[in-house]
Structures are given as C-alpha cells and as structure tokens.
Amino acid sequence: MTTSGLPSPTAGVLERARSDPAYGAFVLLRVGFTALPILMGLDKFFNLLTTSPANWEGYLAKWIADLSPLSPVHTMMVVGVIEIVAGIAVAIKPRYAAYIVAAWLAGIIVNLLTFSGFYDIALRDFGLLLAALTLARLASLYDPAWGRHAATTANPVVR
C-alpha cells in the first residue's frame, strides 16, 4: 500500500512474478534488456566502463570502420544512440523490440568474430542473443500485440 491508501502499481507485478515463474523471467529479462542497452549506449559517449583497447572504437572491426563514412569514434557514438533506442523500445514493446535486440547482437557477434582477440566477448554476446530471443518468446505471452488487450488471466494458456 502507498501512503494514499491505494495499492502500489508495482505490487501486482511483483506478486505475479512470484507466483508465475515464466512471468518472473519475462520481467527480469525485460528490465535487463531495457537497462543494459541504455547504459551501454550512454557509455559510448562517456567511456566509464571501458578504457582499453582505445575505448569502444577498439571493438570495431576494421572492415566496418572502412564502410562507415564517420570516424570510428563517431561510428561508435551512432552505435550508442541505437543501443539507447533499443533499450527504450524494449521497455515500451518487448514483443517486437526483443527481436531487434537479438538481430543487433547478431551483428555485434559478426563484428567481433571478424578480427581476433574478442572471441570470449562474442560468446558472451551469443548468450545475450539467446536471452533476447527468450524474452521475445515470453513477450508473446505477456506483452499483447499492437491493438490487442492483455490476457485477463494470470497464467495464459500455452499452445
């Protein structure tokens, strides 16, 4: 309860997450794929999370840098904007945005595999790609399609 005597808007989400493990997984993945891309995107501008190699542009494959009309630093800033938008999109509509994040992660994996030294990060990002696809599948149950109403039951029928 809030101080106004009304139930907290998050109380229902937390109770449902405790009683329905799949819904709990959906909520955790949604929060993670909202916050983490936004934080990583912001870091493309502030470089607080990485200082080597040469900040974020050190993770950009040369062939991709050569394709970009921008400098590697500015290319990574564009990447940062895309990551921020992806995180916001997951917050708004994970049913669709999770597939966009998965495709984005696939692109990052291709980038990392095309030059040596970052295979461990590519493997980690593959795990994130699988988690994004899992979020998309869970969102098909818990996030209504555009123009449709949410399921009225706490545990929708899985087909």
What do the PLM-derived regions correspond to, one by one?
Residues 50-60:
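Short Gly/aromatic-enriched secondary-structure transition segments
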Residues 1-51, 65-85, 89-159:
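Extended, low-polarity transmembrane helix blocks
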